[in-house]
């Protein structure tokens, strides 16, 4: 894990550690997300945030959760600010079937030259795979991505 990844986590990922951990998938995704966040905290990787993330997070009805999620984002080293460029790219992505927020997150991740955009939303991952040739960022599930980049015993 020597590469310096630039990582954009969507709101689903940022909320995952605070979800009820009753299902195996949720627990495993949480572990992967916490490991990713830890690598960002130590400076091994770079966490990216955006105005779009903050706007969506602030729509969360639970004030305590908002504060917890924003606390995670406070370690971000790069912040993407919205601008005219965002509107045009969001419109392009919405024509492909992305929701407004998903399109804005993808556009923000692209703008920041993110290496990876992580989401626990299976529908968004599938849509992104369908249109991967038209996106400037890879979109993946955090557990699947983290499992791919962890060095295996043979790599050591």
List where the protein language model places each region:
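Active-site neighborhoods of divalent-metal-dependent phosphate/nucleic-acid chemistry enzymes
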Residues: 77-122, 126-130, 155
């Amino acid at each position: 894990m020597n590469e310096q990844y630039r990582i954009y986590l969507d709101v689903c990922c940022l909320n995952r550690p605070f979800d009820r951990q009753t299902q195996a998938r949720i627990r495993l995704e949480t572990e992967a997300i916490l490991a990713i966040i830890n690598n960002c905290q130590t400076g091994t990787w770079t966490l990216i945030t955006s105005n779009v993330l903050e706007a969506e997070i602030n729509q969360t009805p639970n004030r305590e959760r908002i504060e917890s999620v924003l606390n995670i984002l406070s370690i971000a080293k790069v912040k993407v600010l919205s601008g005219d460029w965002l509107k045009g790219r969001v419109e392009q992505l919405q024509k492909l079937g992305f929701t407004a927020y998903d399109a804005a997150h993808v556009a923000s991740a692209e703008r920041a030259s993110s290496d990876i955009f992580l989401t626990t939303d299976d529908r968004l991952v599938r849509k992104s795979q369908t249109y991967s040739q038209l996106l400037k960022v890879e979109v993946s599930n955090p557990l699947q991505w983290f499992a791919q980049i962890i060095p295996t015993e043979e790599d050591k």
